From Swiss-Prot:
This is Valine--tRNA ligase, mitochondrial. It comes from Sus scrofa (Pig). The keyword Nucleotide-binding applies. Gene3D superfamilies: HUPs (3.40.50.620), Isoleucyl-tRNA Synthetase, Domain 1 (1.10.730.10), Valyl/Leucyl/Isoleucyl-tRNA synthetase, editing domain (3.90.740.10). GO terms for molecular function: aminoacyl-tRNA deacylase activity; ATP binding; valine-tRNA ligase activity.
Length: 1062
């Protein structure tokens, strides 16, 4: 087939059905993130600090002055969708015998490949041992098991994109790779979602059902959502070994959880005690620290809470007087943000060195509500410079007060019940009232008694239960705890010794601080959904009137009965055992995942072969709550660290820098970005969710503002590439849909490049072996050098796990080296008859190697295009690009010529100068003559070697040389490349000065106004001075060019003959 320009090549289509893409229009954004350049640790930490400060400002609303980057209101032009409709059985290989569609269509590209990959077993470690490039090394990872609370969000997509890129790279290298899929039962989160669903659909509360009936409802939810999550992972291209899929509530996990609990108990690392815990009154359960959101308040704030008919005020400090016993006019004033806990006060504390209270040491005070006498105690923990320097002590409802009370032997009074109402210890006037209703009644009582001393705004941090939205209380409860100090010390030492590597390294500081201050871990939850605690209460021992309950632990009730018999000295058959109704914290079973997923506690082949894991990759927000606990329990239970390396990526935030939240309406479903979605559908998804009416209104409004035209179809590969292109090991990732769309255009560039290459190769092309390919022209040598350098950069990026380096290198090669330069330069060469043999071989190698380099990040596009390349002689090509060898830097280093690339960059400078001149003089079709002049020795030879590409890329005619020192030709436009080199472009006969000068003047006037405006205005707050200076320099340079162009045109006009002379 003769050569055709890229844009005009339209092969006949069979088996394709074009459809019109929806939605019809979409918003675009100009926001983009720099990526690819490593920064120093010090700069990275400083950047992290600034980002944290900025985020705090955003979330508390005090950064209103700074405007967030806005999505452009420009509508996105819909693209034609081409569907793959060739009959193909599920799991059969896709038919690639038909010509490529004329334009990239994600739905066509992504069809059929994944089921074939799975059926062929490419994702199984057993397959990889048979690969010709097999290294004998093992690489194992487990996916952070997503919660079965709903579908995956964009944060999960980031995790999958990073992990799958690493996994595919190791697999293509020839490593024996295992990537274990799984999902987490997410006790509190799932139970809360199902409870909301039951209330919304059937008007039922959980306790109106039996435990068994409720659990059946949860299992139904799990089956529905678990399948949806697995499908999403497949859509994202996650190359997981699905035959090893596990769930944290399946039979194997249950055995592992029970075994871990029993072993820890026998080792003295697990015990039952009455201690303060985080308590959600709405859920009536203890909750973990990660389920407590710290909400900063700058002052008085009204919040709506579960169970409260009216909003509740927070951020207020109430001052209360405690009269001194025996001195009618003396009192000690304390401030509190929680007057509802006043009935639980057992003392007032001051600092021993606070001179204001020295005379009251050892005295007693009257409780402002009951009149009971309370001691005034001294303790160095009190901060005398805060408020009045005196604090009330409520050991039953404050962790700090509990420690203080323990030091002074004070007995706690629990005045708030599990359901958030006041207990009988408060007296009849408060008993049974909601705690925040009681708050108002207490303040009124203080006013009536003349002991109220004021109310003022007070900045504070309010603990909120992320699952229920209720304010978290600290209650004294009998719970099961894991002793963490000894295990925590071992975890801290592992990082110090280098046995455990945290990347980025700045996370080591948080790690060491957390483990040096770690407390015991409350692992029991008052829920129905989860792993039932394998502990049993011996009823007979409680009946004896023992002050402490008698609990025994066993893998089964029979084992527990044997333990109870030995403990009590009574026959086991005579004992009554009641199993603890509580379940274990979800993080307990999640902490076992790296080894329970491989079969522990059984000694399975997978456990022996793949444990410890090679790498743990997850979000930085899970460093302490999940990673830390995996390290503690893994080391304790298996005798080994569960992994030696931890890679922590950043949080994904929206374009305004806000955390993704359903109530904000900014949560992005990866499928909506992949497939595109109309605004109406987005809004319907919100209405189908579990948001309350107030949250729904806020979320819908935000969604309408952010995506007025919906979301365009971008495809899986573009989404994955975007997520990996950010420097996710540093600051948070601010995702913009328009950025994903730009990488969809990049996919289209690659698509068109391969259509051009395949057309240029023709049907009879036979590729040379890669090692035999030798460039026959400087242009061929240059592109192969670029390809070799790209392989080096990709290898370095994967080895250091800085995927932004990989994406940057690939983007630069495909777009700027291959498409923008080499393909354009080689078109005239390919049009010659007969065609020289060199360029087609180079094109094939660029396509083959380039696609294999790209495959870990864009697996669908790479497979679709690579399958269409001609086979090398001997047909030894791998069946799929998934298992084809990844190009090594070493195998291509003979092509790498840094000096040639440096020299050609000089040619590119000349090309850019010529294009700029053409734009200035609006030479759209003409191909003017060009002269080059250089006084640098040897530089003329450099240009001579690339005269053909220079003429083609610069869109000019004949290219000649002007001797050094020779006068510039009259009326030719000139541009300087440096102090030693200039280019000249002929204008005579190509430009009409009388027509063009007014255009230049109008353009100059417009730019001068912009310059004047920039000089006159004051830079906005937060605007970088360098940005303002850069814009200023750009305008001044453009004005200088226009002035120069106008001068050339006037010279041209003066040199032109008058009508009378003709």
């Amino acid at each position: 087939m003769p050569h055709l320009p890229l844009a005009s090549f339209r092969p006949p289509l069979r088996g394709l059905r074009p459809t019109r893409c929806f939605p019809r229009s979409h918003s675009l954004s100009t926001q983009s993130e720099p990526h690819g350049s490593p920064i120093s640790r010090r700069n990275r930490e400083a950047k992290q600090k600034r980002l944290r400060e900025k985020q705090a400002a955003l979330e508390t609303g005090i950064a209103a002055k700074g405007k967030p980057p806005a999505e452009s209101t420009k509508a996105w032009t819909p693209k034609e969708i081409v569907l793959y409709e060739i009959p193909t059985e599920h799991g059969e290989k896709k038919d690639v015998s038909r010509p490529l569609p004329p334009a990239y269509s994600p739905r066509y590209v992504e069809a059929a490949w994944y089921p074939w990959w799975v059926r062929e077993g490419f994702f199984k470690p057993e397959y990889q041992t048979r690969l010709p490039q097999a290294t004998g090394e093992t690489f194992s990872m487990c996916i952070p098991p997503p919660n079965v609370t709903g579908s995956l969000h964009i944060g999960h997509a980031l995790t999958v994109a990073i992990q799958d890129a690493l996994v595919r790279w190791h697999r293509m290298r020839g490593d024996r790779v295992l990537w274990v899929p799984g999902s987490d039962h997410a006790g509190i989160a799932t139970q809360a979602v199902v409870e909301k669903k039951l209330w919304k659909e059937r008007g039922l509360r959980r306790r109106e059902l039996s435990r068994e009936d409720f659990l059946r409802e949860v299992w139904k939810w799990k089956e529905e959502k678990g399948g949806e999550i697995c499908q999403q992972l497949r859509v994202l291209g996650a190359s997981l070994d699905w035959d090893r899929e596990c769930f944290t509530m399946d039979a194997g996990s249950s055995v592992a959880v029970t075994e871990a609990f029993v072993r820890l108990y026998k080792a003295g690392l697990l015990y039952r005690s009455r201690q303060l815990v985080n308590w959600s009154c709405a859920l009536r359960s203890a909750i973990s620290d990660i389920e407590v959101e710290s909400r900063p308040l700058s002052g008085r704030t009204e919040l709506r809470l579960p169970g409260c008919p009216t909003p509740v005020s927070f951020g207020l400090l109430v001052s209360v007087a405690f009269p001194v016993d025996g001195e009618p006019d003396a009192e000690v004033v304390v401030g509190t943000t929680r007057p509802e806990t006043l009935p639980g006060d057992v003392a007032v504390a001051v600092h021993p060195d606070d001179a204001r209270y020295t005379h009251l040491h050892g005295r007693q005070l009257h409780h402002p509500l009951t009149g009971q006498l309370l001691p005034l105690i001294t303790d160095c923990a009190v901060q005398p410079h805060l408020g009045t320097g005196a604090v009330k002590v409520t050991p039953a409802h404050s962790p700090a007060d509990a420690e203080l009370g323990a030091r002074h032997g004070l007995s706690p009074l629990s005045v708030i019940a599990e359901d958030g109402t006041m207990t009988s210890l408060c007296g009849d006037w408060l008993q049974g009232l909601h705690r925040f209703v009681a708050r108002e009644k207490i303040v009124s009582a203080l006013r009536e008694r003349g002991l109220f001393r004021g109310l003022q705004n007070h900045p504070m941090v309010l603990p909120i239960c992320s699952r229920s939205g209720d304010v978290v209380e600290y209650l004294l409860k009998s719970q099961w705890f894991v002793r963490c100090q000894e295990m925590g010390e071992q975890a801290a030492k592992a990082v110090v010794s280098g046995a455990l590597e945290l990347s980025p390294s700045f996370h080591q500081k948080n790690w060491q601080h957390w483990f040096s201050h770690i407390g015991d871990w409350c692992v029991s939850r008052q829920l129905w959904w989860g792993h039932r605690i394998p502990a049993y209460l011996v009823v007979e021992e409680r009946a004896k009137g023992n002050t402490e309950d008698c609990w025994v632990v066993g893998r089964t009730e029979a084992e527990a009965r044997e333990v109870a018999a030995e403990l009590t000295g009574r026959p086991g058959a005579e004992l009554t055992l009641e199993r603890d109704p509580d379940v274990l914290d979800t993080w307990f079973s999640s902490a076992l995942f790296p080894f329970s997923a491989l079969g522990w506690p059984q000694e399975t082949p997978d456990l022996a072969r793949f444990y410890p894991l090679s790498l743990l990759e997850t979000g930085s927000d899970l460093l302490l709550f999940w990673v830390g606990r995996m390290v503690m329990l893994g080391t304790q239970l298996t005798g080994q660290l569960p992994f030696s390396k931890v890679l922590l990526h950043s949080m994904v935030r929206d374009r305004q820098g806000r955390k993704m939240s359903k109530s904000l309406g900014n949560v992005l479903d990866p499928r909506d970005i992949i497939n595109g979605v109309e605004l109406q559908v987005l809004q319907e998804k919100l209405r189908d969710g579990n948001l309350d009416p107030a949250e729904l209104a806020i979320a819908a409004a935000a969604q309408k503002k952010d995506f007025p035209h919906g979301i365009p179809e971008c495809g899986t590969d573009a989404l994955r590439f975007t997520l990996c292109s950010h420097g996710v090991l540093g600051g948070d990732l601010h995702l913009s849909v328009s950025e994903v769309l730009s990488f969809r255009h990049f996919c289209n560039k690659i698509w068109n490049a391969l259509r051009f290459i395949l057309n240029a190769l023709g049907e009879k092309f036979i590729p040379q072996p890669l090692e035999e390919l030798c460039p026959t022209s400087p242009m061929d040598a240059w592109i192969l050098s670029c390809l070799a350098r790209t392989a080096q950069e990709c290898e370095r990026g994967f080895l250091t796990r800085e995927l932004a380096l990989v994406t940057h290198a690939l983007h630069h090669f495909w777009l700027h080296n291959l498409c923008d330069v080499y393909l354009e330069a080689v078109k005239p060469v390919l049009s010659h008859s007969p065609r020289p043999p060199g360029p087609p071989q180079v094109l094939f190698s660029c396509a083959d190697v380039g696609l294999r380099l790209l495959a870990p990040l864009m697996p669908f596009l790479a497979e679709e295009l690579w399958q269409r390349l001609p086979l090398r002689p001997g047909n030894t090509t791998a069946p799929s690009i998934c298992v084809a060898p990844y190009p090594s830097a070493h195998s291509l280093e003979h092509w790498h010529q840094p000096e040639l690339e440096r020299r050609f960059s000089r040619v590119q400078e000349a090309v850019q100068a010529l294009r700029a001149l053409r734009a200035t003089y609006q030479l759209t079709k003409a191909r003017p003559r060009v002269l080059l002049q250089t006084s640098e020795p040897g530089e003329q030879g450099l240009f001579e070697a690339f005269l053909g590409p220079l003429s083609t890329l610069g869109h000019c005619g004949a290219v000649g040389f002007l001797p050094p020192g020779a006068a510039a030709p009259s009326s030719w436009a000139q541009a300087s490349l440096s102090d030693t080199a200039q280019v000249y472009m002929e204008l005579q006969g190509l430009v009409d000065p009388q027509t063009h000068l007014p255009r230049l003047a109008a353009r100059r006037q417009k730019l001068q106004k912009q310059l004047d405006s920039l000089l006159a205005r004051t830079p906005s707050e937060g605007e970088a001075e360098s940005q303002s200076q850069q814009r200023l320099s750009s305008l001044q340079l453009e004005l200088s060019k226009l002035d120069k162009a106008a001068s050339h045109l006037r010279q041209l006009m003066d040199a032109s003959p008058s009508p009378g002379e003709l």
